[in-house]
């Protein structure tokens, strides 16, 4: 459970449903929270834009209205992805960008033309955005597609497990939105 990886944001109450949220639930956006889907993203009152400038993002993400048991319902929700950025930072001893550079971007040859790291936005507290804000060129994005086609292998390195690629490219939960969710 994510509660074991970032316990400061979770309750000690064993009955609290949030303590059942796993990394898989967060990765698949099935962690159980309600996210208003009736807003148009360009609307300045969209919850994403209101949430974007908040310093207490993790607390806000976890203290929203509950919708379904974790793992049972897909809701496109960038807060679950952002929470993963916090998990990476707090458990790897490096920022999400440094971790991605070491384990993914640099092995894939993904850098700026001057050789520096890619551009990735940070939230008000310094965590890298987990759900958006990463700037890549089409050629750099194509490398991810090729990595998936090669089942996680890049040249002579296995960057992500073939089991993960298999799981990530198959349906995880039935969704009501055609073309969204895996």
Residue ranges of model-derived segments:
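Short, solvent-exposed loop/turn and secondary-structure capping segments
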Residues: 37-41
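Second-shell loop/turn segments in exported
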Residues: 10-14, 45-48, 69-74, 85-90, ...
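Amphipathic alpha-helical interface segments
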Residues: 43-63
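Acidic/histidine-rich, surface-exposed loop or edge segments in extracytoplasmic proteins
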Residues: 5, 82-83
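Penicillin-binding protein/beta-lactamase superfamily catalytic region
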Residues: 59-65, 74, 92, 98, ...
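Solvent-exposed, acidic/flexible segments
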Residues: 16-20, 54, 73-77, 81, ...
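Active-site SXXK
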Residues: 1, 26, 84-88, 141-148
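Active-site helix/loop module of the DD-peptidase/beta-lactamase fold
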Residues: 1-33, 63-66, 92-131
């Amino acid at each position: 459970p994510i509660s074991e990886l970032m316990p400061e944001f979770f309750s000690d109450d064993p009955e609290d449903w949030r303590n059942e949220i796993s990394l898989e639930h967060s990765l698949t956006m099935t962690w159980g929270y309600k996210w208003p889907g009736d807003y148009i993203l360009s609307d300045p009152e969209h919850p994403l834009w209101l949430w974007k400038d908040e310093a207490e993002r993790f607390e806000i993400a976890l203290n929203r209205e509950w919708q379904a048991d974790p793992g049972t319902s897909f809701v496109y929700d960038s807060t679950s992805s952002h929470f993963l950025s916090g998990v990476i930072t707090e458990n790897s001893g490096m920022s999400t960008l440094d971790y991605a550079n070491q384990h993914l971007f640099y092995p894939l040859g993904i850098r700026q033309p001057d050789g520096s790291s890619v551009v990735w936005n940070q939230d008000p507290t310094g965590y890298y955005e987990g759900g958006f804000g990463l700037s890549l060129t089409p050629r750099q994005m194509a490398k991810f597609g090729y990595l998936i086609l090669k089942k996680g292998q890049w040249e002579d390195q296995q960057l992500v497990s073939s089991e993960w690629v298999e799981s990530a490219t198959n349906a995880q939960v039935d969704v009501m939105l055609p073309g969204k969710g895996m």
